[in-house]
A protein has these predicted regions:
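N-terminal small/polar-rich segments of proteins
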Residues: 1-83, 109-150
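Predominantly extracellular/luminal cell-surface or secreted proteins
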Residues: 65-67, 90-94
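Intrinsically disordered, low-complexity sequence elements enriched in Ser/Thr/Gly/Pro
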Residues: 74-77, 91, 98
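Solvent-exposed strand-loop boundary residues in beta-sheet-rich modules
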Residues: 95-97, 150
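Solvent-exposed adhesion/ligand-recognition segments of exported proteins
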Residues: 97-106
Length: 150
């Protein structure tokens, strides 16, 4: 009842899966330079933090743009309402505030590798002393866009 001409056949099956890199972030502590009276007489240093979660072993770079009120040279400035009064400030990658945090890949960005868990990054901010005798009163603000490249 059997067929003696049957031969075993072998073939290969390839299993594949693709895991795309992915990152997500949210601000956990915004930059707040506090309340000041009159001219800024000395550096005001503060920090902000945000949390970044990227897929395990995914390389990433985090960049910051110059903000909504930067001048033509890219210097960051906060503005009070629609009055036009501006207050210069800067954002840095290091606690010594010597490495400006920008948006140029492999140069002024912060790079790292995802772990699959939340990683906290700190932004170091500084408002330098004012050149004039007083700073017009008001609530100064700016909006900086954070870009995550992965």
């Amino acid at each position: 009842t059997g067929n003696s001409n049957l031969q075993p056949a072998a073939m290969t099956l390839t299993a594949t899966a693709t895991v795309n890199p992915a990152c997500g972030a949210y601000v956990t502590a915004p930059m707040d330079f506090g309340v000041n009276t009159g001219a800024v007489a000395s550096n005001i240093d503060r920090t902000a933090r945000f949390s970044l979660t990227c897929v395990n072993r995914s390389p990433f770079q985090v960049g910051l743009d110059n903000g909504s009120h930067a001048d033509g040279a890219g210097n960051r400035r906060m503005r009070v309402g629609s009055s036009g009064a501006l207050l210069p400030y800067e954002l840095y990658r290091d606690a010594a505030r010597t490495q400006r945090w920008g948006n140029v890949l492999n140069s002024t960005t912060v790079s790292g590798t995802g772990t699959g868990a939340a990683q906290d990054l700190t932004i170091y901010g500084r408002v330098p002393p004012a050149a004039g005798t007083s700073t017009p009163p008001g609530a100064y603000t700016d909006t900086v866009t954070v870009t995550i490249t992965y």
